[in-house]
Amino acid sequence: MKPLILGLAAVLALSACQVQKAPDFDYTSFKESKPASILVVPPLNESPDVNGTWGVLASTAAPLSEAGYYVFPAAVVEETFKQNGLTNAADIHAVRPEKLHQIFGNDAVLYITVTEYGTSYQILDSVTTVSAKARLVDSRNGKELWSGSASIREGSNNSNSGLLGALVSAVVNQIANSLTDRGYQVSKTAAYNLLSPYSHNGILKGPRFVEEQPK
């Protein structure tokens, strides 16, 4: 009986690994395009938290820059859109990539949709979740170069004070996380998981990429 159980467990574990790992992304178009500069437009926010758009947007520059791309400064991009009468993320996403190229001179556009963002109370824990999906499009011809998604869930209850203490701690943590926008901190991890060239099916290394030297 024991060998049978162990064998079944091994099969289930193997099946789980096969389900969880996404197939390798086809980077043919990405390699042909060779983008050097990326314009990140304000993300669409499908979550109920109004901080979703700017929390995720503020987290994207670091991983993209470290990946070797020039990223247009968010403040400059926002002001340029305002001068062109565009202040809503949905309206900006509707602008043709070629038009954005005429305005900014960028090689590619990164479109992000935030599907989950914020902190929720779950029985004995307060959980902050950030989930997003993204598409990188060649702004010179509108061709999709890459797409991916990432989701991070982070709990904040490390209390050993029993059931009542855990309940109180979860409520307090949810309030504190909401006031300090814990989602922004978690979105940094989500952005790296989504955009880092070291992630499975992440964005390829750009022309300015510098390999970190071992110490």
From Swiss-Prot:
Task: Answer whether the UniProt record assigns the keyword DNA damage to this protein.
Answer: no
Signal sequence segment = 1-16
Q: Where is the lipid attached (S-diacylglycerol cysteine)?
A: C17
How the protein sits in the membrane?
A: Lipid-anchor
* The entry's keywords: Cell membrane, Lipoprotein, Membrane, Palmitate, Signal
Q: Which InterPro entries match?
A: GNA1162-like (IPR008517)
Keyword Lipoprotein on this protein?
yes
Q: Lipidation sites of kind N-palmitoyl cysteine?
A: C17
Q: Where in the cell is it found?
A: Cell membrane
One Pfam family, short name: GNA1162-like
Query: Where does this chain mainly localize?
Result: membrane
One of the record's GO cellular component terms: plasma membrane
The miscellaneous remark of the record is:
Present in outer membrane vesicle formulations which are used as vaccines in human.
Q: What is this protein called?
A: Putative lipoprotein NMB1124/NMB1162
